[in-house]
Amino acid sequence: MKLTDHQQKMLDGAFGKGKAMAMQIQIGVGKCFDAERLVPVSRAHVSLSAQEADIWFAGKLLDAGASCAIAPTVNPGYSVDYFRSRLTDAAVENMRKTERIYRGLGARLTYCCTPYLADNVPSYGEIIAFSETNATLYANAVLGARTNRESAASALCAAVTGYAPEYGMLLQENRFADVAVRVDAKMESDFDYAVLGLCGKKIGKGIPAFLGLPEKISTEALIALGAELNVSGSYDLYHIPNVTAEAAHGFDLFGGKAPKREVTITQSDLEQTLEAFSPSADGSIEYCILGCPHYTYAQIEEVERLLGGEKAKADIHILTSAAIKRAAKESGLEDRLLDLGADLIADTCVDEACCWGYLAGKPGVTDSPKGAYYMETAGIRMAVRDTATCIHWAKQGRVC
């Protein structure tokens, strides 16, 4: 790879062993993808997990004297304050150690998986290094920024060095759609877009352009679409005419070429996809988990509306950012929800078995296929339904 004088000095250790280590990793990643050079990045987001490999790697950089050239935002681990009675002493120390390491590196401890909404919002064409698959897709597609689907390690190394290898989504020629996806279905709710995202098996590999969708799509629907595309497949970018950033800037979606494939997604496809992912449920419902990805304020308000003043018989857990939880507290929304059996949990991911293990074997429901996928890896099975159905079942404490 062609390195600048500054990059070569960093690799040679002129700025410390930690930065040299991070630079060596970035060069290695670049060589894997035939990148010719490293380019500056202005933002980073690290999919911190507070799990062993994450702590080991970040700790190794810190011990070598690394610090971040760009202060990255970070994904959630788990709230020790909320879950303290359910956590072992080892789990508490695990999260505390994560905090110490990332604070030492100079990260912004936002603990949120939707940084693009408030804490870390890139502009059109900005070169960044985001891990967290829903964040990568939202940044690339909806905002028109440029990031590869970074790992937690490579995003952290980008934050430490200030550089990322130039390949993939950083290059214009790789950002054209090559799969035309005609959507012939009723797209009436945010949840419909989540299920559309689950159709990755039929969409197949590539960059999809979704055709036939409404020109007004909510932020929450676009978040859901991106999150679930990377449950059912591996996607860096998608386009929607007159909705996503490049498609709204006169961008030639297919780069003057015919698409490699044309796919139609019907209403039947959506129904069959959901049924295959989450078979029919019956019996009691003991809990409902919402907020994977983290809920927006508008989504939390919708939960209150759906509850309609009726206290839920099943526990409702809503995961969100600390900033939104704080806003809900200040507005009185959090207290009203608590009275109705719904609690807001900040700084927490569903993919943390130490928090949620007590739910194993208990029947629950969620509006997030991604959340259900994560939970199942910990032996926790949840039905997946739209938000209105989730709240209706939670109010009754049973499938109805």
Where are these regions (language model features)?
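Non-transmembrane, aqueous-exposed alpha-helical and coiled segments at domain scale
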Residues: M1-C400
